[in-house]
Structure formats: structure tokens, C-alpha cells
Design a protein with these regions (language model features):
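Hydrophobic h-region of N-terminal signal peptides that target proteins for export
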Residues: 9-17
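Flexible loop/hinge segments at secondary-structure junctions
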Residues: 19-345
Length: 345
């Protein structure tokens, strides 16, 4: 699967992945094919009485259109509510919450340790992460799903998370005790059996490596010896040029025709899934991504009413429709939407 998408870049690559975050709003150009719909079982937002107040937020520069739509819809219902949002980039969510200068951070990736640790040191608990949108399938710089790729001549077609963990980690939190260092250990035979695996990735910390560490390595430690690049941009070419290479990357950045995307399964025995639009939109593909609103909520304490209702609106039928109308990110599946809404109670 190869997807090449032109992008109107405003002074930066990778706003959602931890690099060069002080940028204007970013939009893909030209408009992209899109086929997502909102699950009809997601509830329509029902207003509460007498809501007034103000909120201040910070957002990634890739989500501004969605935020604007949410604010417009919400303040039409509640004219006595004022919401202002700074485009500070995903990397500003943690620091602004820690400093108390933002009520929420709309962040287009997971929060990195260097962003979360000062918050935990100050408050004694982690920021509450509420998923409010799916990522994109393969839009450059817009929280694209993550894939593992190999050279097109490699006969391997699929791989499990425990196998990837044994290739990339020193801790092996997913249960395979010994490192996987040759292609034969993944079941390849003949000339491939004793050939070394050349593992590639991104220099840490970065939004891509943070996601892979959390979801594939089960928060383990990276092993020594992984070859890396400063961004994911060259990784497709690196794998295309090396018959024995493997790398994770964003699907949008896998542009070299001489690579192949592997199907993934979280556990042995699970079905192996490819990153099709349907699998990503329904969050079935194991490395589909989501976009979060982070807030400072002390465990056991209620959320500010205006903030609670704003997030509830984002998770409502109206809020998810705004995501579809933007035609970049995917709305949440109903079950995930319901789980995230429960966090507001």
C-alpha cells in the first residue's frame, strides 16, 4: 500500500510529532478522498441549563478547523460561554497544563514523558487523557497510522507485537524471552533463515517512537543498536535500499514503491490486519491512532462544568460530525466514544 499526498507545508514538518511546534495552522492541499461516517448510535448532545463561564486552551496546529467548529457549535448553544484557544502545538499541552495557563490541551498525539513528568511532579497525578477523535489514515503530518515496513523482496507478510517487541526492545515486556535477531526467527527459510534483521526507527523522543513504545513495546526500553533517523521521512528509502531492513513509520511517509507494509496482530492467534481505511477508521488496525484532549483533573474530583460540557459536546453526534466535515481525521467508533465519555463523570 502506497499513499502519496501533497501537502501545503507552513514552515514545518511534523507538528503532531514533537518537532518545530510553534507554527500557524496547517492544512493538506489538495482536499483528500474521504469515506468516514459517524456512528448513528453516538448520542446527540443535550444541553444543560444555565451554563456560563470561560475556557482557555492550547491546540496542535493540525486540529484548528475541528476546534473552531466545536467552539462555534458549543457557543451557539451557550452564548454566555467564551472559549479562546492558542495554536501552540502538541508539545505545549503538557507545559501549559502544568503552568495553569490552559484548561485543556487538544493534542494530536500521546503526551511525551518530558511533557508529562513536570505535571506529575507538581500535582502528583497524570493529566487525564480523553480521546476525542481518530487520527488520519495517511495524511502527512496529521496523526497518520503507524506501520511496520520491510523491503519488497522480503517474503514476510505479517508479524505480531511480541515479535516486534523482541526485535526492538531490551526488556521484552510482551513475553518472548530471547531477542529476535534473524529473519529465520520470524519463520523465514532458505537464504533468509540466517540473515540479520536491520532494525530502523526514529531518534527519540518523538511522537512516533512514543506511540510505538507504548503500544508495541508495552512501555519497555529500546534496545541498543537500532539505526535511526531524525524524522520518519527517510525511513521508507532506507528500507527500500536494504534487503534485510525493517522499520516503523507513518503510513503517509511510506512513499517508496520498493517497500511493503506488514499486517499486524497484537497477540499470537489474533487476526492479522492491514491498515485499510475501514480498519483504521474503526480502530481495528492495531496501530490506529487517536487525538486527545488533556485536562488537569485530580482523581475523584469533578471536572469544571464548562470544560466537562465542552468535551461532552466534542464526543457527541454533533462534535463527531464536525470531524467528518473536516475530512482529515476519523470519528471515534461508538464503543470507544462511550468509554471516553464515561471519563467525564
Amino acid at each position: 500500500m502506497k499513499t502519496t499526498i501533497a501537502l501545503l507545508l507552513v514552515a514545518v514538518w511534523f507538528p503532531a510529532n514533537g518537532q518545530n511546534l510553534e507554527t500557524p495552522a496547517l492544512r493538506p492541499d489538495p482536499p483528500l478522498p474521504y469515506g468516514a461516517t459517524v456512528d448513528s448510535s453516538i448520542p446527540v448532545y443535550k444541553p444543560v441549563k444555565g451554563l456560563s463561564g470561560s475556557l482557555k486552551g492550547v491546540e496542535s496546529n493540525t486540529v484548528t478547523a475541528v476546534t473552531d467548529a466545536w467552539i462555534a457549535g458549543f457557543t451557539k448553544i451557550y452564548p454566555d460561554v467564551k472559549i479562546s484557544v492558542d495554536i501552540g502545538g502538541s508539545g505545549q499541552g503538557g507545559p501549559r497544563l502544568t503552568a495553569g495557563t490552559a484548561d485543556f490541551g487538544f493534542i494530536a498525539r500521546e503526551m511525551m514523558g518530558r511533557e508529562e513528568t513536570p505535571f506529575v511532579d507538581k500535582f502528583g497525578y497524570k493529566p487525564l487523557a480523553i480521546a476525542v477523535s481518530g487520527g488520519s489514515l495517511a495524511v502527512k503530518a496529521f496523526t497518520d497510522c503507524i506501520v511496520f515496513i520491510v523491503n519488497k523482496d522480503n517474503p514476510l507478510e505479517e508479524v505480531t507485537f511480541p515479535q516486534l517487541d523482541a526485535i526492538y526492545s531490551a526488556t521484552h515486556n510482551r513475553g518472548i524471552k530471547n531477542p529476535i535477531a534473524t529473519w529465520g526467527q520470524l519463520g523465514l527459510t532458505g537464504e533468509w533463515a540466517d540473515k540479520p534483521i536491520h532494525a530502523w526507527g526514529v531518534e527519540i523522543p518523538n511522537g512516533y517512537d512514543t506511540f510505538v513504545n507504548m503500544h508495541v513495546l508495552a512501555n519497555g526500553q529500546w534496545r541498543e543498536g537500532i539505526q535511526s533517523q531524525h524524522t520518519v521521512i527517510p525511513l521508507s528509502d532506507k528500507v527500500a535500499a536494504d534487503k534485510y531492513a525493517i522499520s516503523y513509520t507513518g503510513l503517509a511517509w511510506d512513499t517508496n514503491p520498493n517497500t511493503k507494509v506488514l499486517k499486524l496482530a497484537v497477540h499470537p492467534g489474533d487476526p492479522f490486519l492491514a491498515p485499510t481505511f475501514e480498519n483504521v477508521a474503526l480502530q481495528k488496525y492495531p496501530l490506529s491512532r487517536v487525538i486527545y484532549i488533556f485536562i488537569n483533573r485530580e482523581p475523584g474530583k469533578p471536572i469544571n462544568a464548562v470544560l466537562r460540557e465542552f468535551i461532552r459536546y466534542a464526543l457527541s453526534q454533533q462534535g463527531q460530525q464536525a470531524i467528518v466535515q473536516d475530512r482529515i481525521f476519523t470519528p471515534l467508533p461508538a464503543a470507544l466514544d462511550a468509554r471516553e465519555t464515561e471519563k467525564l463523570k
